Design a protein with these regions (language model features):
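Membrane-interface junctions at transmembrane-helix termini in multi-pass inner-membrane proteins
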Residues: 139-161
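Helix-loop junctions and terminal segments of transmembrane helices
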Residues: 64-79, 330, 341-358
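Short membrane-interface helical motifs at transmembrane helix boundaries
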Residues: 103-125, 383-387
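Interfacial/gating helices of multi-pass transporter permease domains
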Residues: 37-57, 209, 258-266, 289-334
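Alpha-helical transmembrane segments of multi-pass membrane proteins
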Residues: 110, 118-144
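Interfacial transmembrane-helix starts/ends
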Residues: 12, 49, 82-99, 260, ...
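Signature of the first transmembrane helix
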Residues: 10-68, 105, 109, 135, ...
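N-terminal membrane topogenesis motif
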Residues: 1-28, 84, 88, 250-270, ...
Length: 387
């Protein structure tokens, strides 16, 4: 039986595939957030985004550097014909991601309560606990994404991102809707709503919002499960197209322990650099919520007069989360352009790593210039237009 041949994507083709997937994901995100905001309210969005702001930096530390490291090492090994190394890199990467995923998940569980206390927002905990397992599934998913990126095949990453976003949309809206319906039915029957005794509809909604946000967070977790299932099935069905002949003719591979050390050595600086932006968002989240708490404590009447229409039907205890949710809504489109330009960097890694491995300086130069040129073509008009 004839062995399969590989079809590697060029730098720009790979960037195009990832960019299109990013646009689709962003469109799905808009479709998701508009009905979600209408469903769980601005107060619920405040809880959801507060939980998400803790999730992102831990997620970044857990897996930001590892996919890049795997992509880099796989592409170098492929360029130099070390096909046995490629197989070992995948196995080592999966073990590393499994360990890091477990540690990241435990870290988020441990940090959840201190974070809620520092933000003076204990009701955010249900959403935090529900979104926490997403770190584990994201880590497992990223082991496949980094591997296929290193093979210069961006399609699995792109398609899994669309599956993940679609799962987030469907499960997030369904779970949030179910929680709201359940809580409201309890109120109509005169029962407690999530452990709270309520006197009217406004108090019932106040009790429902934290758990409705947790329902939305369940969409994030289940979306990562959907993306992971797709990648597992894809790998079992199609594999990586490295042939038996290539494996037989490949040189003796590096030891797994050496490969693991190289992955970690490469991943740490990348993860730390990625962490800076996420930590800034976390600090912003804690600082803004604390300042809102302080402002509301002494100026509640002024704020209610200032936003009389918007705060109608909002309990005093929920004003802070309403204002924070309003702030979060304004940021929904902020990361669109950085997300698009980031795909260029991701698609460039295997091309640059392979060129570096074979000392092809001309290809390195052309690849870097191509990335910078396309980035400028995208970023400059958008910067001027948004400015």
């Amino acid at each position: 039986m004839a062995e399969k041949t590989r079809k590697n994507q060029s730098l720009l083709n790979g960037a195009l595939v990832l960019s299109l997937a990013t646009l689709v994901v962003k469109v799905i995100g808009v479709i998701y957030k508009i009905p979600l905001s209408n469903m769980i309210g601005t107060v619920g969005r405040g809880y959801f985004d507060s939980a998400y702001n803790l999730y992102v930096p831990i997620y970044t530390v857990s897996m930001a550097g590892l996919p890049v490291a795997i992509s880099n090492m796989v592409s170098k090994a492929m360029a130099t014909g070390k096909f046995r190394d490629v197989k070992i890199i995948r196995k080592v990467a999966q073990r590393l991601f499994l360990i890091v995923g477990i540690l990241g998940t435990l870290a988020m569980f441990i940090l959840a309560y201190p974070y809620a206390l520092s933000a003076k927002n204990v009701d955010v905990l249900p959403a935090v606990f529900v979104i926490t397992p997403a770190i584990f599934f994201c880590c497992l998913m990223s082991s496949y994404r980094g591997y296929y990126n290193g093979l210069s095949n961006m399609s699995p990453t792109a398609i899994s991102q669309v599956f993940e976003a679609s799962g987030k949309l469907i499960f997030g809206l369904v779970c949030a809707k179910w929680v709201i319906s359940y809580g409201y039915s309890r109120f109509e029957q005169g029962l407690t709503v999530f452990g709270k005794t309520v006197a009217n509809e406004t108090e019932a909604l106040s009790a429902i919002y934290p758990y409705a946000a947790a329902g939305a967070a369940a969409g994030v977790t289940l979306g990562t499960v959907v993306g992971l299932i797709y990648l597992i099935i894809l790998h079992k069905v199609k594999g990586d197209n490295i042939t038996k002949t290539e494996l037989a003719n490949a040189p003796k591979p590096e030891q797994a322990s050496v490969i693991a050390k190289n992955i970690i050595k490469f991943a740490i600086p990348v993860a730390l650099s990625s962490l800076v932006f996420s930590i800034t968002n976390l600090i912003d989240s804690i600082t803004i919520q604390n300042r809102l708490e302080y402002m509301i404590a002494g100026n509640l009447d002024f704020i209610r007069n200032l936003y009389a229409t918007e705060l109608t039907g909002i309990l005093d205890a929920d004003v802070k989360n309403f204002l924070y949710g309003s702030y979060s809504l304004s940021l929904d489109f902020r990361n669109l352009i950085p997300s698009l330009t980031m795909t260029l960097g991701i698609s460039a890694i295997p091309t640059l790593s392979a060129a570096w491995a074979v000392k092809n300086r001309e290809k390195i130069k052309v690849s870097i210039e191509s990335v910078l040129r396309v980035t400028m073509l995208v970023a400059m008009p958008c910067g001027i237009g948004m400015g």
